[in-house]
Amino acid sequence: MVSRVAKNPIKIPTGVEVNVAGQQITVKGKLGTLTRVIHRAVKVTKTDAELQTICANDSPGSNALAGTARAVLANMVQGVHTGFQRKLVMVGVGYRAKAEDKKLNLTVGLSHPVNIEMPEGITVETPSQTEIIVKGADKQRVSQVAANIREIRPPEPYKGKGIRYDNERVILKEAKKK
């Protein structure tokens, strides 16, 4: 029995180079190089323009691992080809963001400005003072950096002030009545 996710092969677009060396998979593209070691219960085979993940043995849970490995590899291929981005929006009076080189400066109502150093392979843009766009080739890293930025001032439930994802809905509570 094969995982439904792992059944689908991953198409390798032109300009993307995939190297399979045992359990270590390296994907190169115009946006960089990503390397990941996959679990030994999963076998990756490469044909002309496709990658296929299959279970290497019949151990319990290997179907799930094959599906997970397929999703991770698909994200790696997409990441080096088109990249990933997360958009954050700041809501609040005086809340501002400014990107400088590999740093993000935030003014979010604290007694001091917050400076965040971006990790390798991650870029940050501020199209306006209240918008932050985090870009990169590694989906996990982009999402983690965006979550770290949001964690500085998460949206509060009464007025909705804080840093939120662009598509996030904040459910507002009603104030206490007398």
Swiss-Prot record:
Keywords: Ribonucleoprotein, Ribosomal protein, RNA-binding, rRNA-binding. It comes from the Bacteria. InterPro entries: Ribosomal_uL6-like, Ribosomal_uL6-like_a/b-dom_sf, Ribosomal_uL6_a/b-dom, Ribosomal_uL6_bac-type, Ribosomal_uL6_CS. One of its GO terms (cellular component) is cytosolic large ribosomal subunit. The keyword RNA-binding applies. One of its GO terms (biological process) is cytoplasmic translation. Gene3D superfamilies: Ribosomal protein L6, alpha-beta domain. Pfam families: Ribosomal_L6. One of its GO terms (molecular function) is rRNA binding. Belongs to the universal ribosomal protein uL6 family. This is Large ribosomal subunit protein uL6. It comes from Coxiella burnetii (strain CbuG_Q212). The lineage of its organism: Bacteria, Pseudomonadati, Pseudomonadota, Gammaproteobacteria, Legionellales. The gene is rplF.
